[in-house]
Amino acid sequence: MRKEKMSGNLFDEIRSACQAVAERTLQVRIDYDRLASYAATLPLEEVARPTIDPSCHHIGHGEDTLSFFVILDTINFGSGYFPHLQKRPGMSGYFTIASFLTDYCKQNGPFSAQALVGLTTSDCAQIFVQDLVNPPIRELMECFAHALNDLGRFLLARFSGSFHSLIEEADCSAERLVRLLCAMPYFNDVEPYHGVDVPFYKRAQLMASD
């Protein structure tokens, strides 16, 4: 993934890039006449006050909960692999991963930054109860391991291994947190589209939300 030069308001840059993509698309278009009526159907109260499922998330444990969400959001990608994922009954791919991570944290305690650096593909397969014989799942677990290794090294290099110090450094600013996280390759999701660099920063924005 490529580094993106960021200046000004980061979220304005994201919105502007998305607008540029919408204006350049060839196979889809926005029906502006219906945009207002569609927007009126959106459940804004739910968006403003999101809820977290306690059965799938390790909540109520102070700094352990903080580290849980930092780790979960670090690996909140890979939906293209989810058809191959061994899911828990009635759960989506995301909730399957979240619930297995919750189970691991309850049984073994929180991960340290040093532990994240040492995680292997096999470790991830054990944590998330997946079969590495399946090639797409092996690839996903490799990506999870790389992303978590990056997180561990980042925390050790910048924050003496402290999850809390990472959040403190953001100083209650979602934008600053996103900028900090984009120092890691898996968070720096910027892609070119018809001559425009399009920043998504999906996982970084989700971490700020969580």
Residue ranges of model-derived segments:
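HhH-family (HhH-GPD) DNA N-glycosylase catalytic core used in base-excision repair
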Residues: 1-210
